[in-house]
Amino acid sequence: MPTMRNSIFSEKVYPILLSAYRWYLRTPERSLEEAYKAALNIKAIEDEHFNGNKIDFNSAIYSNSVMDYFESDLAQELKTARMRLTEFRFSRWFSNESHQKAARKAGIEYPSSTVILEKLKFIDEIISKYIITDYEIAAPSGASDLQVRTTSLQPPENPSLTDSLRNNDINKNNLVERIYTPTSPPQLIRPRTEQNKKPRGKADTTGILPRSILSTIGRLQIELDPNSEQDVINNFRQAQKRSIISIRFILLLIIVPLLTHQLSKALIVSPIFNHFKKADTEQIFLNSEMEEEALSTLHRFEERIKFENLISNAPPLSAEAIETQIKEKAEEIAAEFRGESANAIKNVFADIFSVGAFIWLLLVSKPSIMVLKEFFDNVVYGLSDSAKAFIIILFTDVFVGFHSPHGWEVILEGLSRHWGLPANRDFIFLFIATFPVILDTIFKYWIFRYLNRISPSAVATYRNMNE
């Protein structure tokens, strides 16, 4: 029997492990090559359609549909290049002299340092052109290149003229923002007007003309400006891009961990578990709760058979027949709980893969996280005060309200059953007694620290509705 197992291992398992080890040793080379191919694809688009220049989405040469096609290809290639570069850096970080010796023994030849440096230099040259692209999408609407450049200039000596120009610029941005979104969060406007400035007194900010007149003049200038329509279109396109990227990223955060859990459980964890388990020593019950449930089910089945045997008009069953039915039911219950125990063990490892995929997605999607934050800011701060107060009350009542302990108890018991752990009542009660309190404190701190400063009317509405 051991000889047969050794032959099976050498014929089937060992080649798989060897190929997996060779794949692991080739990770740096493979990652760099894929990143290099992605950079070559971007370069090909530039040479073929943009005369070797950077892909310009504001170009009037192509239609919007064509530019959307180029933008989709560029985003995909940039994502591939960045992901593979990250994989290359991590694999190089884990690589050492022993890995290189093992690679040479396995017949793997790594490229020379000169080739690696040339490829990295080419990749950096291509990607560096588009580093700011993701941040432009996440940047507040209305922020133009002119505003970025003027922040480094020295202010003029006439404070009235400075305030007039600044108010006109702010009014133009505010008007453009109000056209494509009802309300914008105050903190998105403040960094453009107050960043890197020392606080000034009222005497320093007072000009020759009242601010209302300057605001009216600025609004008239915006209405007469022929470029205002183009600004509105550009801001609307940026808002549309933010919405698409945010919704897609939210779906990825949900779908990727779920798919990883199911695929890893079916393709990786289950075959390994089924290969190494032993049927004769396999444990039926992982905890005492499973055993109690199985015995209770078998006891109810036995009592039901005896009850039906007493009230039935048919000839009564013999003790041997009753024993046979009970034995068949016991084997059925054992198979059922054996499957539940195995499934619980598989869930532990599949959840580890799922959490790893979720963390990996967060690490490689930092620009998308910035866009998502901007999207949530526009959505949340665009709500009315009553809607904000309603959402706050809904979340606080669900998670930290009077009936929330029952929900937390169901969640913790379901999680314990998912992993095959016994439901520890002491831990559950301790968790319910502490975690909702901490969560309630965080809610209150956020409301009175941030929301009270940003939207005092929403806090007042929340207090009235809560009372």
Swiss-Prot record:
Segments of skewed composition (Basic and acidic residues): 191-203
Record function comment: Required for H(+) efflux immediately after light irradiation to form a rapid H(+) concentration gradient across the thylakoid membranes. Together with PxcL, contributes to transient H(+) uptake following dark to light transition.
Transmembrane segments: 249-269, 352-372, 391-411, 427-447
Pfam hit, one: CemA
Matching NCBIfam families: PRK02507.1-1
The species this protein was found in: Trichormus variabilis (strain ATCC 29413 / PCC 7937) (Anabaena variabilis)
Subcellular location as annotated: Cell inner membrane
GO CC annotation: plasma membrane
Matches recorded under InterPro entries: CemA
Family: Belongs to the CemA family.
Top-rank taxon, per record: Bacteria
Region (Disordered): 183-205
Protein name in UniProt: Proton extrusion protein PxcA
Topology term for the membrane: Multi-pass membrane protein
Statement: the UniProt record of this protein carries the keyword Membrane: yes
Keyword terms of this UniProt record: Cell inner membrane, Cell membrane, Hydrogen ion transport, Ion transport, Membrane, Transmembrane, Transmembrane helix, Transport
HAMAP family xrefs: CemA_PxcA
MF annotations from Gene Ontology: proton transmembrane transporter activity
PANTHER family in UniProt: CHLOROPLAST ENVELOPE MEMBRANE PROTEIN (PTHR33650:SF2), CHLOROPLAST ENVELOPE MEMBRANE PROTEIN-RELATED (PTHR33650)
